[in-house]
């Protein structure tokens, strides 16, 4: 793959060149931070990947809005861990003004809620921005298109509880796992 990089640490001329190469299809992939041009209007972006947790839904929505501007199918992928949340919370806790700190925490909580959705993501985003999706199923987000498998885990839970009780709760999880596995 032909890829370029774009971040605030690059010299201005290198950033400009990376952006031009991407716009002119000389580079297929651009790996960028949020420093990447807000005004990028490339209609055929097919994939936007967030490798870390965004700070706000506003920022996330603006960034994913770069995908599929030509109306063709595109994908957005968001990877996150709870470590991302803790990192953002560390910086939020550095904010001295309580009102600003509370607002930043609320925005972070909204992003986390979005990440943990099991219902339509598009509906959630549109509602957040004061719009409405008439259907509960957009037929395009992962929550709406996922084939969900369920199973009754009550037997497994009973065996785990039985193993804990039979060992008088004196052992750690690794020992209990060994007992269960035989």
Describe the predicted segments one by one:
Residues 1-36, 40-182:
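C-terminal helicase lobe
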